[in-house]
Amino acid sequence: MSDHVKITPMTLNFGPQHPAAHGVMRLVLEMGGEVIERIDPHIGLLHRGTEKLIEYKTYLQALPYFDRLDYVSPMAQEHAYSLCVEKLLKCEVPIRAKYLRVIFCELTRILNHLLNISSQALDIGAMTPLLWMFEEREKILNFYERASGARFHSAYIRPGGVAADIPEDLIHDIFQFVNTFPKFMDDVDSLLTENRIWKQRNVDIGVVSKKQALNWGFSGPMLRACGIPWDLRKSQPYEIYDELEFKIPIGEKGDCYDRYLVRMAEIRESIRLVEQCLNRIPDGPVKTDDRKIAPPKRSEMKKSMEALIHHFKLYSEGYSVPAGETYMAVEAPKGEFGVYIVSDGTNKPYRCRIRAPGFAHLQAIDMMAKGHMLADLTAIIGSLDIVFGEIDR
């Protein structure tokens, strides 16, 4: 009998109905035994034509579409769109609104990373982190609901400011959350970080070098895990990030384990940012006083005919944005989320292009998984942090 067993190449379908695919993703794998030789990702199963739909909506009506892109971290998308429209309008946002935006964007980052770390752990076989982390996520979703009235699709950050001010008791409750949360993170750390099985499944899996990360267009934790300290909140500061103190966590190897460590460290930095904002937040208005962009108060509408007209015009016709084009990007939890808008001077965008960070990360899956075992693929997909709402758009 021969010592060499001939391995027949095999084509394997992974997804689109697979619990570890993180959405409707189909991967066509070319296998040499149990080793991955090539991966061909098939996307577009969640394509809804968002960019085209936006062309038929007013600038205010287009906003809720952004909540539905990366539906795990909705406020980050709204933020990029609002900043882009404000840049075209040359609209100044009140300082209290800027603080509220940063508070909720950082809570959104925590929301996103909690889901990613817990689902990555579940894919590998650790169930406890998921149950613990979803309990904490529920608290943040409760803050979302108290601020905007919705748990997920909040439409809270709008061009000109935010939808509404938050009550004093909500600020107090966020403070309490911020004070108790680091202890929870220590518990998760003790559960995963030095866990032998967790390290065996993640260390040296899906390694990406600095050069490869830049060539593939990586951003966010995926890029920082490779050792490149690039963060738009530091390199191209927006809102009040230049006034706040925080570090940029970076990795060394660029493997699945480093990506996990970077996200864990980012959660702690986000807590620091929220705490600083809560300590410094000033009183004042939360939306621009230009009534053509932001609606007047209900009390004003009961007294002033002009306020009533502004309200009606805003929600029926919308506002016209000066002709021009601009690109605005924010450091979303998954990476650089960018919005490019072309305005022709009317009340609807002529063109809206969305740059989703997950799209670039998913492209590199063939490069990352080649030569690894099939079982390692779930760890790699889990560490990518992909959501198909933003990839397929």
UniProtKB/Swiss-Prot annotation:
<keyword id="KW-1003">Cell membrane</keyword>
<keyword id="KW-1278">Translocase</keyword>
<keyword id="KW-0472">Membrane</keyword>
<comment type="subunit">
    <text>NDH-1 is composed of 14 different subunits. Subunits NuoB, C, D, E, F, and G constitute the peripheral sector of the complex.</text>
</comment>
<keyword id="KW-0520">NAD</keyword>
<protein>
    <recommendedName>
        <fullName>NADH-quinone oxidoreductase subunit D</fullName>
        <ecNumber>7.1.1.-</ecNumber>
    </recommendedName>
</protein>
<dbReference type="GO" id="GO:0051287">
    <property type="term" value="F:NAD binding"/>
</dbReference>
<comment type="similarity">
    <text>Belongs to the complex I 49 kDa subunit family.</text>
</comment>
<dbReference type="InterPro" id="IPR001135">
    <property type="entry name" value="NADH_Q_OxRdtase_suD"/>
</dbReference>
<dbReference type="InterPro" id="IPR022885">
    <property type="entry name" value="NDH1_su_D/H"/>
</dbReference>
<keyword id="KW-0874">Quinone</keyword>
<dbReference type="GO" id="GO:0048038">
    <property type="term" value="F:quinone binding"/>
</dbReference>
<keyword id="KW-0813">Transport</keyword>
<dbReference type="GO" id="GO:0050136">
    <property type="term" value="F:NADH:ubiquinone reductase (non-electrogenic) activity"/>
</dbReference>
<dbReference type="InterPro" id="IPR029014">
    <property type="entry name" value="NiFe-Hase_large"/>
</dbReference>
<dbReference type="InterPro" id="IPR014029">
    <property type="entry name" value="NADH_UbQ_OxRdtase_49kDa_CS"/>
</dbReference>
<dbReference type="GO" id="GO:0005886">
    <property type="term" value="C:plasma membrane"/>
</dbReference>
<comment type="function">
    <text>NDH-1 shuttles electrons from NADH, via FMN and iron-sulfur (Fe-S) centers, to quinones in the respiratory chain. The immediate electron acceptor for the enzyme in this species is believed to be ubiquinone. Couples the redox reaction to proton translocation (for every two electrons transferred, four hydrogen ions are translocated across the cytoplasmic membrane), and thus conserves the redox energy in a proton gradient.</text>
</comment>
<keyword id="KW-0997">Cell inner membrane</keyword>
<keyword id="KW-0830">Ubiquinone</keyword>
<dbReference type="Pfam" id="PF00346">
    <property type="entry name" value="Complex1_49kDa"/>
</dbReference>
